[in-house]
Amino acid sequence: MKNELALKQRIAELEKLLAQKDAQIAALEERWSLAQQKQFGKSAEGFAGQGELFNEVEEIVEEVEAEQQSISYTRKKPVRKPLPKDLPREQVIHDIIDKTCDCCGGELHRMGEDKSEKLEFIPAKIKVIEHIRPKYACRHCDKSSTQTQIKQASMPAMPINKGIATSSLLSQLITSKYQYGLPLYRQEAMFKQYGIELSRQTMSSWIDKSATLFAPLVERLKAELLRQPTLFADETPLKVVKSDKVNSYMWVYCSGRDSPDPNNPIPNIVLYDFHNSRAAACVVNYLDGYQGYLHVDGYQAYARTEATLIGCWAHARRKFIDAKKLQGKNKTGKVDVVLSLIQKLYGVESRIKDKSVDDKYTARQEVSLPILSKLKIWLEQDQPNLVGNSKLIEAANYLANQWHKLIRYVDDGRLSIDNNRAERAVKPFVIGRKNWLFSQTANGAHASATLYSIVETAKINGLIPFNYICACLDELCQPEPDIDSLLPWNFKT
């Protein structure tokens, strides 16, 4: 009897262990399948929609037919875009020598011409500017042995004191690295082609000094940023060689939109802030008591701020897309219900993107709120009963935990449905990081944060970063620079 009881206990333990192993195997298989999808599958997060789940077959058929009809009428043969008219033109005439008729020998007359344009590239031109300052002295004082006075014009203020770099050269270095992701060792090789020896150490020193000059302008932009009613924030890792931490972080904060919009009262600003940690203190100290709306992902550090947090439906949707990938091809299930509803929310946003703030608020209250109610019902009814697909459980838990932040965007027409604005602002830094890989020192990372801020803010305000940085450097090296005139929306080209 005793042995039988012990045997049953042993069987129960083994069954429990087997269930744990099965769960681990299932989780590993899900991770492997998702990794395969990410590496070899489509990278887009598209979702065709599952209208039949909501008895909307007729609506979908009408949409498809309308789309097909639109395509059949609007499809055009690709046409090459004309070259800009403001580019200088150089004419090359290809004429015949013999202008007599091969048939009768008569003189040919000109009846027209064919013209085609080819785009020529002229390599960068580098020159040396010699600053000559004549010296003047008084001959009378020389002869009378009195004190000789020498007069000479003072040197104009330069970004790099006693250095050879002009504003244009510094702007070239900065835009090459921070706009186009060109590491300094490649720029060093490019200058060698012109017979100019510029070491990486020298260029790095110039970039650090330029970043110091830009610091007052970045502080002015930050003050302007923190005055806005709505902000976006995100962060991404950065390796710093001479640091005790494995990963440091570049935080990004932005306002406005990705491009100039005269109808948008909120200025377009992107600012980067480097820290050697991802602690909540980083964002708390930077925002300095900011109490407006802050669009974020689910990272808990943002909850320590005084801002009203707005959740990101793109993050929520992405988690359900991962669950959809594990569901298998041509299969439908609970994940499709959620994705279809989220797709409808984005459909509303697509239709109202050019509307006024009041119109956006009205549309969201009338159309988006009922969709959110359906999502809430799904959460309450289905989330407790989810089994199997761990990614679906993870996505549902994220949706439930972030729900109060995710639904806030419908309460104000100034708010966005997601945090894609910040994610797009992070992308140029991520692309650049793939080229130069890391920062050597924390000081270098701080300089990068400053210069990325300047380059990206110039871009989203429709400015050419090279020209803007040149003008800024010329002004910022003055004894009393006019900072307000350098704000992108005040800048005169």
Regions found by a protein language model. Give the residues of each.
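Short, flexible loop/hinge motifs at secondary-structure junctions
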Residues: 1-164, 203-204, 232-233, 260-268, ...
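Catalytic center-proximal scaffold of phosphoryl-transfer enzymes
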Residues: 135-493
